[in-house]
Every structure is written in structure tokens, then in C-alpha cells.
């Protein structure tokens, strides 16, 4: 079925959840980076908060003084259907997505509207695939989850790295991420929601596996293994049980360029073994506490949604992801790096993902797709122009 024609809609792009911590950062980035003539709007539950945000944006970007404000609520599916029907691309920062996300995904899938989010919740993404993939494919909607620090640096970083290796050969990539950044209440809330549901997460993954096509004649793996010592990066690698390896594997399954036999492993890179062990134990303790309702409420209360690191703290933050790759007799190390990953750079990644969907000449895709599949090199170029670095460290 051909993609729905959305060119006559009122807006090119709508940002939903604009008044939250990450949403406001994304709005500020868009205010200074949307191309001339872009028709965009802010959306959320509270008109008063949207007006306050618009006033702040207009102080540095006077053109925002007349920015349209749209009221919508995740508890009112009708308002979300109207939102989706009025725009070509809909960006949402409203989480936890397991709690608030599905009505908007459903609305976009039905309307043929491109959808972009920051979701790092594997269960949610798997459930959305099972429930809305067919509808989105039929309408032409591109449903692009994980368009922030989860999982853009890894997804595009591996695509960039694979492009430097010979074609048609088995490829191995190990990713090592290092950062000094803090996190917000919204991020903590989403992480605790996901960590508290291991059984439901496993069930959603099995349901997806039953219906999702597998690559024919090719092997794609993203195994979870023990800690490793990397001589190339001079770090210990602590396996990270995050969404990112799944996203990388889905890109590899969709793109033949990743070779006939592709494997990706994902680690937190730390300099000293005691830190590696402590980090693994700490993550395990948080996951265990998340199973206990009273402990989960206590952890959630450490930061309220809408809270986050100060501008000064974010200015000191950084991330680096090194990829150790081999294939066809070639071995190399690449790196993706930038500033504050959780907020400043995430807002940049999310906004540029939406702008790429709205304005770039992209491959024809539909349904639930990754950033590497939907936007690929176009988004990598955008992020490089915006200051996120992709490069070869060692060949």
C-alpha cells in the first residue's frame, strides 16, 4: 500500500511533552535549528506551561513568539488522534512509555504519521511492534523508537564502522561506552518501570520473536556475556543489559551491508576491575530493589520527573563510545563522542532525528524501524554538523 500523502497537513513537526525536562531542551534546540519555513508546534497537557515555555524560547528566538500551542493528553486518545492527523512528524518525550506511550503510537500508525521517541524500554518497543507494525506498514508511518542516547550513538556508530569494513564478510563489533553524566527524574522513573517487569519484558520479547521475520541466509547475534578486558581500549568491559544491542541487531538484520554473520557485544568501559565489579553489583541491586513496590517508590522519590542536572553540571558532562571491529582481515577502532549524553546531546539527537524524517531524502521504509535503517547516513551527517563526532581512532 502506498505511503499516505501528509504534505498538506498543518504542521511539519509537533513536539509532544515539550514542558518536561528533556522536552524543554528539545524545544530549545528546535527553536534555533528548524529550517526557514518549517511549520512546527508545541504540545502538552498544560496550556499555561506551554505558554511559559514559548515565552522563554522567544527570548532567544523571537520567531517563537507566535509558535502554535496544542493541548493533548495521553489519557485522552481522541486528542492524540487529532494531534497525529495534523502533522507529518510527531516527536514525544512523554514517559514512562509503558505507562503513557501506546495511544500515541497507535494514532501515528493509523494516520501515516512518522513517530519519534526517546524510549529505552525494550518491553514497550516489542509490544508496539506486535500491535502496530502491520498498521504502520500499511499507512506508511515510520515508528522510530530509541532516538536519543538510547540508542543513536550505538546504532549509527556501528553502521558507520561497518561501512569502513570489507563487504560480504563476517563482522564482529564490540562497543565500550564511557561517560561522567548524571540523569533526571524522568529517566529514573522510566528505568525503574522497566526494571520492575522482567517477566513481562521476557514475554513481550517472545511474542515479538514469534511474528518478526528473520534475515534469510544471514546470522545476526547480540549476545550477553561475561566482563572482558579490552587491550585496544585499555578498559574493562562490563556487559550492559540495555536496549542498545537489540537496536543494533535489528539494524543488522535489516541491512545486508552488515555481512553474512554479524555479532555485536555491548559494554560499559571502566579503567579498573574493582569499579567494573562494583558497577555490575550496583546495577543488580537497583534491579532487585525495583521488584519491591516500597523500594521502587523510595528510589523514584530521589528525583521527581521534570528534575535534572543543572546547566553547569551538563556542561562538564561527556560521553565516548569506542567500537572495536574486525572483518575480512581488517581490524579498526572507531569512536562516537560528544557532550552531555542524557540531556543536551539527547535533545540534539531527538530533534535531528525528527528533522531528518521531515526534510531529508531518505530510503523508502515503513513500520517500526531503527535510526540506522530509517535515516542512516543522513542523520549521521546531521549529527556531525551539530558537533557529535564520528571518527577512526586506529586502523
Which residue stretches match the model-derived regions?
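Short, conserved SAM-binding/catalytic segment
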Residues: 53-64
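C-terminal catalytic/substrate-binding lobe primarily of soluble NAD(P)-dependent oxidoreductases
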Residues: 2-6, 163-395
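Structural motif
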Residues: 12, 88-89, 114, 332
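A short, Lys/Arg-enriched amphipathic alpha-helix followed by its capping loop at the start of a domain
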Residues: 29-37, 255-256
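N-terminal Rossmann NAD(P)H-binding glycine-rich loop of SDR-like oxidoreductase domains
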Residues: 12-31
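Conserved glycine-rich Rossmann-like NAD(P)H-binding loop of the short-chain dehydrogenase/reductase
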Residues: 35-49
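Glycine-/Pro-rich loop/turn segments that contact NAD(P) or position catalytic residues
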Residues: 97-210, 243, 250
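Conserved Rossmann-fold cofactor-binding substructure of NAD(P)-dependent oxidoreductases
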Residues: 70-89, 93-99
Amino acid at each position: 500500500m502506498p505511503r499516505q500523502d501528509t504534505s498538506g497537513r498543518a504542521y511539519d513537526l509537533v513536539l509532544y511533552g515539550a514542558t518536561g525536562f528533556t522536552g524543554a531542551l528539545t524545544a530549545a534546540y528546535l527553536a534555533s535549528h528548524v529550517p526557514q519555513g518549517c511549520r512546527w508546534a508545541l504540545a502538552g497537557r498544560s496550556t499555561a506551561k506551554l505558554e511559559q515555555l514559548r515565552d522563554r524560547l522567544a527570548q532567544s528566538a523571537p520567531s517563537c513568539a507566535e509558535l502554535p500551542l496544542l493541548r493533548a493528553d495521553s489519557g485522552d486518545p481522541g486528542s492524540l488522534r487529532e494531534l497525529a492527523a495534523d502533522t507529518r512528524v510527531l516527536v514525544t518525550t512523554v514517559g514512562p512509555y509503558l505507562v503513557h506511550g501506546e495511544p500515541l503510537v497507535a494514532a501515528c500508525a493509523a494516520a501515516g504519521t512518522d513517530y519519534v521517541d526517546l524510549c529505552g524500554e525494550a518491553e514497550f518497543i516489542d509490544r508496539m511492534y506486535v500491535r502496530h507494525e502491520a498498521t504502520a506498514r500499511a499507512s506508511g508511518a515510520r515508528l522510530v523508537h530509541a532516538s536519543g542516547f538510547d540508542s543513536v550513538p550505538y546504532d549509527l556508530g556501528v553502521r558507520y564502522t561497518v561501512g569502513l569494513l570489507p563487504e560480504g564478510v563476517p563482522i564482529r563489533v564490540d562497543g565500550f561506552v564511557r561517560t561522567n553524566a548524571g540523569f533526571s527524574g524522568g529517566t529514573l522513573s522510566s528505568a525503574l518501570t522497566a526494571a520492575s517487569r522482567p517477566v513481562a519484558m521476557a514475554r513481550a520479547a517472545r511474542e515479538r520473536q514469534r511474528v518478526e521475520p528473520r534475515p534469510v541466509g544471514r546470522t545476526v547475534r547480540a549476545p550477553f556475556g561475561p566482563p572482558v578486558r579490552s587491550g585496544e581500549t585499555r578498559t574493562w568491559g562490563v556487559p550492559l543489559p540495555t536496549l542498545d544491542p537489540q537496536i543494533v541487531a535489528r539494524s543488522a538484520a535489516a541491512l545486508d551491508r552488515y555481512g553474512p554473520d554479524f555479532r555485536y557485544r555491548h559494554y560499559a568501559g571502566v579503567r579498573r576491575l574493582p569499579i567494573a565489579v562494583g558497577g555490575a553489583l550496583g546495577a543488580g541491586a537497583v534491579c532487585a530493589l525495583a521488584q519491591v513496590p516500597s523500594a521502587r517508590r523510595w528510589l523514584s522519590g530521589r528525583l521527581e520527573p521534570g528534575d535534572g542536572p543543572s546547566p553547569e553540571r551538563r556542561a562538564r558532562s561527556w560521553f565516548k563510545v569506542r567500537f572495536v571491529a574486525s572483518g575480512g582481515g581488517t581490524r579498526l577502532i572507531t569512536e562516537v563522542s560528544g557532550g552531555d549524553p542524557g540531556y543536551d546531546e539527547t535533545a540534539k539527537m531527538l530533534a535531528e532525528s525528527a528533522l531528518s524524517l521531515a526534510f531529508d531524502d531518505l530510503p523508502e521504509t515503513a513500520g517500526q524501524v531503527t535510526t540506522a535503517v530509517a535515516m542512516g547516513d543522513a542523520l549521521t551527517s546531521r549529527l556531525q554538523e551539530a558537533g557529535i563526532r564520528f571518527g577512526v581512532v586506529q586502523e
